A protein has these predicted regions:
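Short, Gly/Pro- and small/polar-rich lid/capping loops
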Residues: 2-23
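Conserved mixed alpha/beta catalytic, RNA-binding, or beta-rich assembly cores of soluble enzyme
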Residues: 17-95, 99-108, 115-123, 129-137
Length: 139
């Protein structure tokens, strides 16, 4: 498997934004093309902020037949945003075959377990929306 880019899936989309959910569980994903790499900002809830940053770098998978990635995770103290940031990075990095930095901050005061599950699901949905939009047309 060759990690060289055959095309740049973000070339036609220097910036993209996706939103899903409502109220306390709403999330937004912004993608910004940075050269041949990507910066993702995942925010939501009542108090968007930066709670974690994940850097993902593509590599050949351990099985050697696909692209995978290595991740470095930096959470702010007492923040769990790294959970969604890492999940987003692990989905986008191999799909885009580029280095990606994901900054995440989603906060709603006293969120219930149900709201937290909805937030996680909404994060997955915006990533799928982004991947569908980016890969919808051949380049």
């Amino acid at each position: 498997m060759d990690l060289k880019k055959k095309h740049d899936p973000l070339a036609s989309f220097p910036t993209l934004s996706f939103s899903f959910g409502s109220g306390r569980t709403a999330v937004r994903l912004h993608l910004l093309r940075v050269g041949s790499d990507c910066q993702a900002i995942l925010i939501g809830g009542e108090s968007p902020h930066i709670g974690a940053v994940v850097l993902a770098v593509p590599r050949i998978s351990l099985k050697g037949n696909a692209v995978s990635c290595d991740c470095w995770v930096s959470p702010a103290p007492a923040h769990k945003d790294y959970l969604v940031a890492q999940s987003v990075a692990q989905k986008l990095c191999p799909a885009l075959n580029c280095v990606i930095s994901v900054s995440a901050g989603i906060h709603s005061d006293h969120a219930t377990e149900s709201e937290l599950q909805t937030i996680h699901a909404n994060c997955s949905t915006v990533v799928e929306m982004a991947l569908s939009a980016i890969t919808a047309e051949p380049f």
